Design a protein with these regions (language model features):
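Ser/Thr-rich low-complexity repeats and stalk/linker segments
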Residues: 1-161
């Protein structure tokens, strides 16, 4: 079985014998079936209402016409999609916090200040975040601060300014 991507709507793989049935069991216990094609490939749709998340395990077995069942194959779902770049509200000169909006609650925001120092914060349930300006760092008119958002899988967004 190929490693499924978080949020995917299909799971794919390669079987041993064309015409055999593939049964995939999803993390919530639901199953889906597919057939091994002439080229050996198969595809099974993720059932409606089932979501594949980073770290979930998906299993598959192949059954031939005689009812023989293969050993179970297991794949762990991976998340390789970076979050969207966070928005940064323009801070005023002398501000002691930088605020903005992130794309997913719980993600980590890392702000880089003009002097190269960094600070971190967490995206809240409402999508907002705030990061304290490090001690010894002063924001002046025209200074640019950047922010990136990192999800639980370690995917890092583009910079937001």
């Amino acid at each position: 079985m190929n490693v499924p991507e978080a949020g995917a709507d299909t799971v794919t793989g390669t079987g041993d014998e064309p015409g055999n049935t593939i049964t995939v069991t999803f993390p919530d216990g639901t199953t889906g079936t597919g057939t091994v094609g002439e080229d050996g490939s198969w595809s099974v749709e993720v059932p409606e209402g089932t979501e594949l998340n980073n770290g979930d395990e998906v299993t598959a077995v192949e059954t031939d016409d005689a009812g023989n069942v293969s050993n179970e194959g297991t794949a762990t779902v991976v998340d390789t999609t970076a979050p969207e770049a966070p928005t940064v509200n323009v801070p005023e000169a002398g501000a002691d916090t930088v605020t903005g909006t992130g794309s997913e609650p719980g993600n980590t925001i890392t702000v880089t200040f003009p002097d190269g120092t960094t600070g971190t914060g967490t995206v809240g349930e409402d999508g907002s975040w705030s990061v304290e300006v490090p001690e010894g760092t002063e924001l002046n008119n025209g200074d640019e601060v950047t922010a990136v958002e990192t999800d639980d899988a370690g995917n890092v967004s583009n910079e937001g300014t």
